[in-house]
């Protein structure tokens, strides 16, 4: 944590999953016992508090999947008491569970939204009303990219030109070709 803070990172996420790490919305994951989880968070908080670091500590638990909501809430209460700045229970199953988490565990909460995942996709304003301060959608762009790639490959297989793609001129602008050209012209 001190290394990340020294490098300028704004925050780190410390989680309680057993190794090997798995996606929170997939099967086969488990969490370490509470004592080890507490030690992980405590070590991160102590590292943050050493010197002049202001890095944020996000505590994550995947306990809801294998030990239930009560255990996940208990862990978050403890992580908050230890000094975690942001609280993240992964793969929350319902809106009612979200409300319960916010009600029972004071602090700044994050929610992870994955299309077709375990957590319901609520509107951002609804998540704000429930009490979430951060919402992430970590797979949205990758999922959209895969879908359009599949469509393009299907079209190529069927010998059809793809029309649902960026124009080459737009792509050049996005990746910075025009800047490269300007630099090239400047130093000819």
Q: What kind of region is each of these model predictions?
A:
Residues 1-139, 143-154, 183-188:
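Alpha/beta enzyme core
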Residues 158-188:
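Flexible C-terminal active-site loop/helix
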């Amino acid at each position: 944590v001190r290394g990340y803070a020294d490098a300028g990172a704004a925050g780190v996420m410390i989680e309680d999953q057993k190794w090997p790490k798995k996606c929170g919305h997939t099967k086969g994951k488990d969490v370490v016992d509470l004592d080890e989880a507490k030690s992980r968070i405590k070590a991160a908080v102590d590292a943050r508090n050493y010197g002049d670091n202001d890095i944020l500590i996000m505590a994550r638990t995947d306990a809801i999947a294998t030990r239930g909501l009560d255990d996940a809430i208990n862990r978050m209460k403890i992580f908050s008491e230890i000094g975690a700045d942001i609280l993240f229970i992964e793969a929350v199953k319902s809106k009612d569970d979200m409300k319960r988490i916010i009600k029972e565990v004071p602090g700044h909460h994050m929610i992870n939204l994955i299309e077709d995942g375990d957590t319901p996709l609520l509107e951002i304003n609804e998540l704000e009303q429930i009490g979430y301060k951060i919402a992430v959608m970590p797979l949205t762009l990758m999922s959209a990219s895969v879908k359009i790639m599949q469509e393009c490959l299907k079209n190529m297989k069927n010998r059809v030109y793809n029309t649902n793609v960026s124009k080459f001129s737009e792509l050049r602008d996005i990746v910075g070709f025009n800047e490269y050209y300007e630099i090239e012209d400047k130093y000819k």
